């Protein structure tokens, strides 16, 4: 018997919404389980990654709710910043530079709100149990106020500064970015060997950035490199440009890369920046903020970086300065959003000062439970590798404005008062004079804050939205992907330490990435994108959630049809198991039994009690995959394949004999275990669980399975368990014998010859004959169970 899965799932979405099943009711802290939900961006559609990682959080939310906790599971959208700007530009064709600030902000808000409404339906469709009727957005006045208030808190604590300092910039996105927004990417390029000169002697250096020649301020060699020891302290002439630079020594120079001599430019990479700082070298900028060559680049002025690279090599070749070129593959720092190699500039930017707190960040990270534990190592590696303070300035329109003006007369920085927040200095005039010179000639800060500067405050934003920050902070759980440990996990831990000297949550649960069936990362260019809605239409949301539970927490996953098929088959199996119980039950009402007498019923209740205890332990340990695997085995093999088949002849025989107590007891037991199975599956497959629950006429039913209690009743009948477990082994032997004789399990056979414990097998002769369709059984004593069938 099949079921229209999509129709069934949509029915329960409407029901949960109408009944306010997931509304949070405040309670004492020890009765609350508070979750820091990842607020997705509004820039685009849901994808398979969402249907993998978000259910991981929902599994725990639903489980904790059934364990009696008041679950604070808020929803939000991260709708400020670069992703939204790019989405708006893509949707409308309007660039930020084509519009004024107010108009572009209005456009961003309008499109974001429209996108949020349609996206909400998708999140409901995959069964998320957040409270969607009241959600926060990071662009709201409330969120902006909190973000600006925390900025002023940083000012008071001496943890924020504005300085002319190195900043990382993306030429494509035309904005500064922070170290947490960079990623290393392997790229193919040319290593060009260029001759400098030291008097009449050539000095060959190898570089992947020949377009930076105009910014060369020194040549470095390793002090232990005998080839160049006599050149240290002398000057080299830069080809084409003709200027002279010092030859210096530093142990960081790799003698085995290229020629062992490297030029230092301001700035080609992190190494250039480090040596520039260390030796107080001159500053020459040959690339502007838009990724174009400046006057310092001489004949390359006005060219893009890629065009300049080609042009300078041509010029160097013509001048006889190129020794050779090699094709290499090397690691390049790129902007994680667009993949463009980053550039380093010197400009006035806002920074959060935190490099001196690295040890404290490590310590606080260790106060948090990491699931899986090894993900903490990734966090610590990131913290230990930090080299710069956190740059939080962004040259964009749409974002949280800095609550700052500058005095045009004396240069003083003027901060807004807390009572004025939220404020946008680009639009609003200051309410006060310069507190240094009294001037009213104040100009606004036009930059906005990095998106992560606000996203790092989500525990505060979400809890404050409901007026619960002081009551439930720190929260209990953060769920997120491992790809943003350096973004969201780190920045949230850092801000919590700086502002509150606390941890933001007691546990963080990390999910992996989604790949195609061949282990390839999914992308439009590869043509391997899988549409989430087509998967839901084909298999149902419960099947997608089942798939999400097939790997251990933190592991990556592949999209394999067999996993979705297994999920759908489980949904149908549950539906059909319930239908079979309905048939066996007939018109009878379910009677409750504090104790049961029939050995088969005593056996299944014992097995049920044991498996529920195992599943509970796994769920308490955040081992959802192990819990579901154990449940699958019990449901398919123990409950369906054995128990439900065993009770058919039991009920038939008892009904014929007028033994209605046994009939009622068996109907109760089957319904009770089916209910427990539905409850145990409920966190993972909430739709079919609700369908089963609402159609089991079991006394004491609540408004939804998802607010009912978790199965934890302990009934153990050791006598019956041993006896019936032995009979199950006999059943397995007879089924195997049928298979060996090439007879299907459902086909009737004339004779079955069975060896084993004769007295016990004899006791269950009628059950075995009826269940396995055997006309005649020959039973004999034997040390081991064995069976043969004769069709």
Curated annotation (Swiss-Prot):
Record: residues binding ATP: 524
Spell out the reaction equation it catalyses: tRNA(Val) + L-valine + ATP = L-valyl-tRNA(Val) + AMP + diphosphate
Q: What is its EC number?
A: 6.1.1.9
UniProt motif ('HIGH' region) ranges = 40-50
* Cross-referenced PROSITE patterns: AA_TRNA_LIGASE_I
Per its UniProt record, what CDD domains does this chain match?
A: Anticodon_Ia_Val, ValRS_core
Out of the domains of life, which is the source? Archaea
Could you list this entry's UniProt keywords, alphabetically sorted.
Aminoacyl-tRNA synthetase, ATP-binding, Cytoplasm, Ligase, Nucleotide-binding, Protein biosynthesis
Function as written in the Swiss-Prot or TrEMBL entry:
Catalyzes the attachment of valine to tRNA(Val). As ValRS can inadvertently accommodate and process structurally similar amino acids such as threonine, to avoid such errors, it has a 'posttransfer' editing activity that hydrolyzes mischarged Thr-tRNA(Val) in a tRNA-dependent manner.
Give the family from UniProt.
Belongs to the class-I aminoacyl-tRNA synthetase family. ValS type 2 subfamily.
The protein's name in its UniProt record: Valine--tRNA ligase
The gene from which this protein is expressed is: valS
